[in-house]
Amino acid sequence: MFASAGSDSLSGGAGVDIVDYSRVNADLTFSRGGIMAKSGDLGTDTISNFDIEVIKANPNRVNTIDGSTGTTASLNVNLANNLLTINNLPRIGSASITVEHFQNVRGSENADIITGSNAENDLSGGAGDDLISGLSGSDKLTGGTGNDTFSFGRGDSLLDGFDRITDLQIGADQIDGLVASNSVRNFGSVGSLSAADLSQVLNNRSFGANLAASFSLGSGSSTRTFLALNDNRAGFQANNDMMIEITGYSGNLSDLQIV
């Protein structure tokens, strides 16, 4: 069924039911109770819980899955696989919905697993001990309260599209990256984020294989802080070594756990 402007109640029946918002020129926010808010005063739909198996958003708009109003349920969201699973539902347990063309996620008050896509995602865990992974693309990652893990795989958060963790809480949060380290070496400041400037500071002698380093850019209130994780070759390699912005972190960088 094709969605439109206005506030509608949508339900399915036997078989695979699809609600298609691809023709609706609005940003969507899908939240607890099957509520689908459409930006621009286009109304709010109510989608009958779990009668609908597939929700298609407009790929040219910014669309969000919002679990922040939930009190008991937790979320498993994988935007790369277009899959939303809601856990701890009364009388049901878990239920899954295919969600296409969503870029952003706000987690619940519980322990969520949130995985982004190759787009630029804005992923927020909310309360609870969350596992958050942005995949490729320049992602904004927010853990919220709880002991959160930010997970990065090979090819994620490189120089040409690095991620930003907005609220890294050292001592509570940890980073699951290419290297395991219980210490981060401070390399001072860099003049720019060009590969050439980074290679001068993170050179073959100082930035050894499997090393974790921190450095800053700018000064005063404009100072930004970054982590660099070397994969297995000395010196900074823009196409291989991970770089993560952690401006605004709390705690002592020397205590950061990278697992």
Where are these regions (language model features)?
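Generic structural motif
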Residues: F30, V77, N186-S189, A209-S214, ...
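Right-handed beta-helix
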Residues: R32-G34, A80, T85-N87, N147-G153, ...
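Low-complexity acidic/polar repeat-biased segments
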Residues: I47-S48, E53, N63-T64, G93-N104, ...
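Acidic, glycine-rich calcium-binding repeat modules characteristic of RTX/beta-roll
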Residues: M1-S74, N81-L83, S94-S96, A111-D197
